[in-house]
Amino acid sequence: MDEQKVKEEIVEIATRCYDRGLLVAGDGNISARVAPNRIIATPSGVSKGWMRPEMMVVVDIEGNPLEPSDLRVSSEWPMHRVIYQARPDINAVVHAHPPYATGFAVAGLSLSKAILSEVVLTLGCAPLAAYGTPSTRELTDAIEPYLEFHDALLMANHGAVAYADTLEMAFNKLETLEHTCKISFIARSLGNENTIPDRAVEKLFEIRERNGAMRPEARTGQVCSYTPGENGDRATGRPGDRENEQVALTRAELVELLVESAKLFQR
């Protein structure tokens, strides 16, 4: 593998993240595995908008330097390590603080509802990992349970991380996560976030499995409300699909409805 090209690609991804406002200043970190125990990563304390390929550091899985450098690997290296150890299929990790995704994480919300078919096909849900102090075992312990069956995570009061086979795919997953959180935020602000019906989610999962984008066991391993009967609190479909839908009213709303109905009969 041409390591110089990998370093240049990491800088390109870092620049995209910076230019799109997915991170600021020295926030976030990016890495790419080029051999089983050889990883190229962004250095600590350097703005992602000002990086150069020669600034990249080369480390082993434990974060020990493999090449001389005046720069150190990010203090959040343990997060990258646990992802690579849990997922042999993963060769790139992108961690950032996208505003909408991080807003969800601060609000205690996961990206748990199937609201866009493209997202079900390409990303799946993004669980919310409990808060853990950055750069400590607390954080790695918080994210580890979700790594096997999910390709992106929200981290409470921290940010988001996405991982894939390539740097481009990992960035795409992070960008998709942020875009979906933004759409979800807009829908919730408008007062209604409809979800894709369970049977449609099943079809999307089947397509994803056929394309090799998801292992069959990952379907039931998803911790979000993507499994049948658990897909959010509302489901869309043809008008007839909602005839038997239960509707909850407060006592005051029920009284008002009955009063208005009585007025109709008095006219």
Residue spans of the language-model regions?
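Glycine-rich flexible loops
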Residues: M1-R267
